[in-house]
Amino acid sequence: MEAFRTHTGIGVPLRRSNVDTDQIIPAVYLKRVTRTGFEDGLFAAWRNDPSFVLNQPPFDQGSVLVTGPDFGTGSSREHAVWALMDFGFRVVISSRFADIFRGNAGKAGLLAAEVTQDDVELLWKVIEQHPGTEITVNLQDRSVTAGTVMVPFTIDDYTAWRLLEGLDDIGLTLRKLDEIEDFETHRPSWKPRTLPA
């Protein structure tokens, strides 16, 4: 997983709340056996509407999604995070995330930055008044900057550390590879093995 320090990209105002994972990516798109190629399913029902924000330039090139509260509710779908990332998003900003979505996002490298609802409204105002406004999200100092507006965001320290280090679950495990190999070499030969003999 790529380490995350800062990201600058076009802000996209998604003026919707209670966006569940089935709205992010409908179940029909979950049949794939790969982890990529889900961008066509992102907000599929809404993208049929030509006036939907992601169908409008310059928002169709955005990489920082600013959305209403309760984003990512519903079932646990890693595919929802993958669809957002495959479309090009690196950051989602909201005043409240579903816990399971927040966890899946952090494990995949998507930053879920939590701000106050007043700050969401302020960011929406800036990017709607000036389409194409670039938003810079700095994980190290936990700030969001859009033009002259700067707001703080919150994220738990553990997830921030994983993102800063670029550590997914496999990366975390591989940090302990020496200890794993040492354990395996000292296991009695009659026990099952995970490493070749």
Curated annotation (Swiss-Prot):
- The molecule here is called 3-isopropylmalate dehydratase small subunit
Taxonomy of origin reads: Bacteria, Bacillati, Actinomycetota, Actinomycetes, Mycobacteriales
* Broad enzyme group: lyase
The reply to whether Amino-acid biosynthesis figures as a keyword in the UniProt entry is yes
| InterPro entries referenced in this protein's UniProt entry, alphabetically | 3-IsopropMal_deHydase_ssu, Aconitase/3IPM_dehydase_swvl, AconitaseA/IPMdHydase_ssu_swvl, IPMI_Swivel, LeuD
CDD domains in the record? IPMI_Swivel
Catalysed conversion reaction: (2R,3S)-3-isopropylmalate = (2S)-2-isopropylmalate
Gene Ontology biological-process entries = L-leucine biosynthetic process
Q: Which Pfam families match?
A: Aconitase_C
Key words of the record: Amino-acid biosynthesis, Branched-chain amino acid biosynthesis, Leucine biosynthesis, Lyase
